[in-house]
């Protein structure tokens, strides 16, 4: 059995997950309803569709990680708990084959789910408005796929480090809280915590570049910044804090840097997860 065989077998098994398709179907129906009911204010059909997808991006930022985590949290932990990993490694396959095969299959599952979600939203938006800004929709899909892939990578990496379902669930829930909710909950988000430590505890002068840099470490914030790269000029949204109207953020806080944030969140968790899996006692 090769890496491709592992990926194909796991894809076939994972796509039967009722929880995964329940989440994807619910999200697809929700986006279709939003697309049907959305109407732009004094805008033409094409700009209305662009604003629609821009608005749905806020919802995707919170819900797409759930799709990715549900699809991937048991990728390797499930095999370890059931003992199936010993069968896979005895065929023979290397641990690298198992790790990459599982990653590829879960990416395939999530991509299929995302295609379904975007297809339903796009079909409803076109039927409602009679316009399709192909470049913007394709760009939003690409950015959303990249964002979702980050959480697939994180989930597979975490799954490779644990051997029990309960721990895999705890790791998935914890990652969602730390990387998503902690950046959006009013009063306790990461930027406020960084500001409190920097100013109140350490006694330094306010440094909004520092607070924004801390905020930019989240895949969610990177996703919101990346959406500015695919919408027409004038429809971008402010994502980071602006202490004053005249504030000009440094280059490392630019929208383009969101791609680097994604790259780091793809590479580092996978490297650590593979390293832990390679040395695990199975």
Which residues make up each language-model segment?
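Transmembrane helix boundary and interhelical loop/hinge segments in multi-pass membrane proteins
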Residues: 48-53, 69-91, 102-103
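Membrane-interface alpha-helices at helix entry/exit sites of multi-pass transporters
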Residues: 94-106
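Hydrophobic/aromatic residues in alpha-helical transmembrane segments
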Residues: 65-72, 120, 154, 183, ...
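Hydrophobic alpha-helical transmembrane segments of multi-pass membrane transport/permease proteins
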Residues: 18-40, 57-69, 171-182
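Terminal transmembrane helical anchor/hairpin motif
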Residues: 37, 41, 181-271
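Membrane-embedded or membrane-proximal helical elements that form or frame transporter/channel pores
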Residues: 41-73, 245, 249-252, 256-261
């Amino acid at each position: 059995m090769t890496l491709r065989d592992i990926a194909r077998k796991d894809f076939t098994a994972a796509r039967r997950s009722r929880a995964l398709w329940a989440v994807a179907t619910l999200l697809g129906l929700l986006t279709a309803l939003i697309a049907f009911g959305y109407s732009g204010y004094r805008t033409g059909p094409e700009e209305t569709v662009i604003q629609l997808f821009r608005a749905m991006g806020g919802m995707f930022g919170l819900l797409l990680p759930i799709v990715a985590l549900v699809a991937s949290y048991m990728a390797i932990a499930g095999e370890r708990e059931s003992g199936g990993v010993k069968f896979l490694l005895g065929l023979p396959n290397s641990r690298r084959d198992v790790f990459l095969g599982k990653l590829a299959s879960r990416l395939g599952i999530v991509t299929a789910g995302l295609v379904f979600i975007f297809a339903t939203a796009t079909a409803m938006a076109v039927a409602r408005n009679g316009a399709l800004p192909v470049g913007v929709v394709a760009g939003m899909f690409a950015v959303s796929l990249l964002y979702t892939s980050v959480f697939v990578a994180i989930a597979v990496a975490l799954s490779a480090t644990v051997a029990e379902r309960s721990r895999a669930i705890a790791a998935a829930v914890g990652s969602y809280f730390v990387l998503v909710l902690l950046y959006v909950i009013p009063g306790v988000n990461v930027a406020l915590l960084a500001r409190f430590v920097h100013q109140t505890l350490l006694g330094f002068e306010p440094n909004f570049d520092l607070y924004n840099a801390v905020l930019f470490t989240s895949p969610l914030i990177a996703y919101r910044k990346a959406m500015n790269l695919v919408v027409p000029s004038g429809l971008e949204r402010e994502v980071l804090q602006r202490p004053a109207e005249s504030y000009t953020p440094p280059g490392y806080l630019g929208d383009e840097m969101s791609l680097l944030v994604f790259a780091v969140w793809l590479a580092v968790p996978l490297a650590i997860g593979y390293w832990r899996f390679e040395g695990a006692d199975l």
